[in-house]
């Protein structure tokens, strides 16, 4: 995990500005998927530079963003100064420094591909959400991964490819359901001119 964290700390300086169709589509997917859902207290895992935070806080009363990259969070804090937002440097593989039963929405974007064991994340999410709380996930599509796509960036002329773990659609669903969630929706998201979906999204709910 340290290598992945170091890579994201290096990537942070260009993350918002380089050509990245996965990042851009994820932003669109998040807005489209959550625009008709009411939420007030949000837990954003893997908030990164705050690319989705900016829109989410237009609907939320409070947001807590967790990320393992200090440099990404530095960008987020410069970009977002709202008192509604708290950013915390934390590794979601470990215990999360937030209270249980505190949020009605959790979001995870382009993060779980860097997590080898999903169960800890879903179990923790289940505890942090209130009854009826929803969990939105958007990740690189398993088919896109199998085609060789990985998170990567260029630094000083050298291509840096980040370590990722392959998770199938069923891996996400089974881990979430094992934690107690119900699946509400699943959708494939495409680039305009590609046959293979770039992203996959899930919406889960903690039973009321």
Task: State each model region's role.
Residues 105-118:
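A short SAM/SAH-binding and catalytic strip from SAM-dependent methyltransferases
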Residues 47-94:
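Class I SAM-dependent methyltransferase SAM/SAH-binding core
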Residues 119-131:
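A short glycine-rich, Lys/Arg-flanked "PGG" loop and its adjoining helix->strand segment in the class I
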Residues 164-180, 186:
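Short alpha-helix
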